[in-house]
Amino acid sequence: MQSLLLALLLLPVCSPGGASNLHEDLTLLRTDLALRLYRSVAAAGNQTNLVLSPAGAFIPLELLQFGARGNTGRQLAQALGYTVHDPKVREWLQTVYAVLPSTNPGAKLELACTLYVQTGTPLAPCFVEQVSRWANSSLELANFREPNSTAMLANGWGPRQTAGDEPVGSAWERGGGAESAQLVLVSTVSFQSAWRHQFSSDTQLLPFTCAQGLTLEVPMMYQMAEVNFGQFQDPAGHQVGVLELPYLGNVASLLLVLPRDRDTPLSHIEPHLTASLLHAWTASLKRARMEVFLPRFRIQNHFDLKNILYSWGVIDLFDPLRANLKGISGQDGFYVSEAIHKAKIEVSEEGTKASAATALLLLKRSRIPIFKADRPFIFFLREPNTAFVFSIGRVLNPLH
């Protein structure tokens, strides 16, 4: 049997007539799928910080749809809720993927997927052509027989690692099978940008009440700016504040969802978040001048996507006896042995200039409304024009 390693290396770094209805429906579908992935990961993560990148997780699965046949293809379509074999879906996704990459001054957004193929492995010409046209994807030859070759490929493709980052390859080595791989898919979503409105460089230590009730002193960033803000209620009656912080060039924004009641845990809000609800909230945000307090945080996660997909009914893809990926190669026996997702996000003052008189602003009383994220919150890194979600996560303890 031929082993296919599906690696998802996702490293975001942060310092919407008939056709329109279809596009809106697909946007909501993708957001609901992203939220489903978030809930699946959150359920297994217990009381921990979390970040994941739905965009990078689903692009390789879309590529696999081009090569999946029979029950394998049906399971993928049922899990995703759409199929790239539908011309309208394919056209919409290609349009979205085409407009996402950005190299505006002060902002950089990259979206890519590379399919590494063992030298000598025959591939279907149709599949090769489809890969070349999908989400800035490309095909490269590799020799997986060399020691640690898959690790080097994955780590070399993604943005440079920093101290403390665990190589994706180490997760593969624990799972095994790398040396027998014939294909490796590596997906990257990379975002780096300065804020449109600068945070002060004079960050102060302020209290943050963690999920367990423990209060810690954490680096709390501050700015006074015109922002999009609203106060809403979820279907269960929980009150939340929603704030949108734009990045330079409007290439993306950070959407924050904060419970108004300090005694309301995120676990009471997470099950009620839907794409329709988020759309209604963001459409109702109003411009307001506010004082914004946001903790500096850095989160890195990696997890086995295979377990989640298995719980979604994607079973045959990982079974060497049942997987049907004949659209990739004329050879029998291709299956996916590993699906590793790795994501990182860093929210800080970097890339912005210092503001004056910050200490006074932090301490004085003011009639200006305040948004203070001094307790657990949920965040969405998204493209504002298409509502495309790059990353979802939560902060339970900014120091972890």
Curated annotation (Swiss-Prot):
CDD domains: serpinE3. InterPro entries: Serpin_CS, Serpin_dom, Serpin_E3, Serpin_fam, Serpin_sf, Serpin_sf_1, Serpin_sf_2. The record marks R365, S366 as: Reactive bond. It holds the Pfam family Serpin. GO terms for cellular component: extracellular space. GO terms for molecular function: serine-type endopeptidase inhibitor activity. Glycans are attached at N46. Keywords: Glycoprotein, Protease inhibitor, Secreted, Serine protease inhibitor, Signal. Residues 1-19 form the signal peptide. It is found in: Secreted. It comes from the Eukaryota. Belongs to the serpin family. Probable serine protease inhibitor. This is Serpin E3.
